[in-house]
Amino acid sequence: MMEKEIVITGFDLISPIGVGQEEFWTSLRDGVSGIGCLDGTTPDSAVRPFVAAAPDFHAKDFVKPRKNIKVMSRDIQLGFVAAMMAVKRAGLNVDIESPENRSVEPERLGVIFGCDLMALELSELADAFYAGMENGKYDFSKWGPNAMTKIMPLWMLKYLPNMPASHIGIAMDARGASNSPTLDRVSSLASIIEAAHIIQRGDADVMVCGGTGNRSNPCFLSRGKSYRLAPWTGDPQSVPRPFDAGRVGTVNGEGSGALVIESKQFALARGAKPLATLRGYCQAVAPTNELLNMAESVERSITGALKKAGMSIGEIDHINADGLGTVEDDAREAAGIKAAAGDTPVFTGKGHFGTLGSGTGAVELAASLIAMEKGTLPPVRNCEKVADDCPINVITKEHTVTKNAFVKINQTNMGRSTAVVIEKY
């Protein structure tokens, strides 16, 4: 049982299927896919990478002053805007100009925001690269004197993984704890857990947490084998196929999700309306270099989170799984879920938008938070026939929510599994 109750008072997201809760849920409910081909490619292109971009998101519509965008990579833009949207949803006044109206003191407000190791935009280094060319060959001796003059002095600040949390914190004058977990797909959930620890030990009243990722960048796409991507042939909207007998790989996307969490006592005192309670959490790691034991890691993260929550699996409405859509990962995750949760219904959103890197967990968690309010959860997209090596109760038809709590889990390719238990308030 958690020593101090931690509640969620606001959340929001940016995803390939919608900007904000309303667009996202409508697309999820209607079975919309956000997956297409890389911008700039045509049917005649030699290679047409599948990606899940967020075409309806334009930072200039949200970031003020706009000049700040110059030092924000796509990852930072996504994370910053999602966080500000979540803060607004929570009714949290963080006005720097009118400190007397603030909902929380700067020293009692912190930011823990997960982020990937960001990939640069190739166009930003093009001039620098060509500055070292001579007679069709690259002269490395010219990199220092010639190329560096072609790079913006603040270029590096666009790609440091701590910058999403930095920009969010500066905008709110948050002077409390700040960190940037860089843990692949578990980054968002790890951020929520760390933020909860900070509140529980009395070092903050309110924390903004979540994650952001842009895996649709060509630099990430060039490492397709490392990320077990689906082949770039056929209909891009037919993949990923989580837990399906015909699954062939995942798809890289971009997105961000953010939550405002606070102690229940503080939230009620400021007149906020709690949406859900963080009941428990657990992180587990498979033995080094033994990914076949990933199932054990998944099982231990779920059972550990339930134990901390003081709940049984019978009280859980559904498991919001990782469901990457790859042959190996899905089978291992399914084995762990089966061992820990039996026939508990299983949902994943990756059939709609692929993997969003460090933004994955918070965006997917938002789906379950909305579902708990709506009372229904749509079927897992692209899962037409549950695979024999995934013996779990995948939601293949509309699911009616009958219980007040769910478990969200994510894993990494290095054997780490993270789980949180969330209960509707």
What are the functions of these language-model segments?
Residues 1-68, 90, 265-277, 366-381, ...:
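ACP-dependent fatty acid/polyketide chain-elongation machinery
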Residues 13-16, 66-84, 128, 152-157, ...:
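Active-site pocket-shaping loop/turn-to-helix segments
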